[in-house]
Amino acid sequence: KKKKKKKKKKKKKKKKKKLKKKKKKIEKKILKKLDEIIKEGLISRKDKILIAFSGGPDSVFLYHFLNLLKNIISIEISIVYINHNLRHDVENDLRFINEFSNSNNVNYYIESVDVKKYAIKNKKSIELSARELRYEAIETIRKKIGYNKIATGHNLDDNVETFIFRLLRGTSVTGLKSIPKTRENIVRPILDFEKSEILSFLKKIEAVWKKP
């Protein structure tokens, strides 16, 4: 029994060491990516960035990532939540957005769109309709508040998924493209981070995000 207890303790110590190493790697990667973003000009001093915010881990990580950047260069950030009128628990989402913005002292905006109506009228899928209306609504708010950029929380897993999806659809090798880091006034600052890295960092800083 004593031997078994010792083995369990050793396993726990090994797990803790691995987690510490992983956390240090993520911290280094974050600092490196912040530096790259500044050098590449993806985000510049005095940029006003509107974050497409759902309350999920990706958008919460994106907020904290840009907040770190805010401490390095002078940028302004706000968050926007789009209600697609497709979920029954929207009230929980709105409550979370309000609590998040208050606890992080960040301005937030909410816009409502009727995805089903748009999909029927334009004979498009719900997914495509939601995407089109979402970007349209975010762009409208961006102009209204005088911001110059929109940031989305696409990560490395999304990028790989998009590439594979296009490959399976039979897209030619020359036509295969992953998600771009920037397109017009839209930037994707966390595109090089894996989902596991995002979750690990959020747990480290004890961040709260909305569960699906």
Task: Kindly label every feature range from the protein language model.
Residues 44, 140-148:
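Glycine-rich phosphate-binding loop signature in dinucleotide/nucleotide-binding domains
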Residues 63, 90-98, 195-199:
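Short, surface-exposed alpha-helical segments at coil->helix boundaries
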Residues 23-51:
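A short, basic/flexible loop-to-alpha-helix module at the beginning of a structural domain
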Residues 64-71, 99, 140, 169:
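Short, well-ordered alpha-helices that flank and scaffold nucleotide-derived cofactor binding pockets
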Residues 82-139, 173:
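ATP-dependent adenylate-handling ligase core
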Residues 149-153, 158-212:
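Catalytic subdomain that performs nucleotidyl-dependent activation
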Residues 1-25:
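Long, low-complexity Q/N-rich tracts
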Residues 43-93, 109-115, 180-182:
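ATP-dependent adenylation/pyrophosphate-handling site
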